[in-house]
Amino acid sequence: MPDGLISLIGFFSDFGDENILWPVMALNGLLLIVQARRKIFFQWLALVIVVFGGMLVLKLEFEACGRLPGQNLYSPSGHTAGTTFVYGSMIVLFGRLPIAGFVGALAIALLAGAARVWLHVHSVAEVCVGGALGMLGVLLLTFARYREIQTSSKQKKPDWSVVVLLVGVLIVALSLHGLRSPAEVWLEYFSHRFVAPFRHCPVTLSTT
């Protein structure tokens, strides 16, 4: 693959870094509060905990014993999970058709996962796990959004706050683009140091 194409893929993949995702989620939550959508705000917040907490548990579990020969699933892709859920949930929460948001999230999951594989950062198995976790969060949010639409008595009108959100997300993403979160290194260290003693890790013998 040409170096220019790899650089372009890396550029877009960086929009899924945690340094960008967390501020974007903060903007999402703030807009839900401004719109007085309290119920779906708490449902969305619970799913944030499920998706990111679930990824935390998976990483600690799979990385504990270190990378073993022939192992295809070592570090589930939090990048793919986060990108899928954060940007997919934006479309579901603030779009007119929740199902369109779900389809959009699926497209994001495929592109984000493929990018991580092309960049040789994760295996196919690792991005599949991450994408599945992110899509699970989006799916549950889609159901919640449909219930919100069915129970809402207000007629949907153009909301300029959504435009403000998009502008804010764009500013945040471009401002923080390229900054690398150290979370991955910290998780790997914590897993090796504190989780591994509770696991029955296989012992690999070196030959001399």
Features from the language model and the residues they span:
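Hydrophobic alpha-helical bundle signature of multipass membrane enzymes
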Residues: M1-S75, A81-A112, P158, P197
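Membrane-interfacial entry segments at the cytosolic side of transmembrane helices
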Residues: Q150-L166
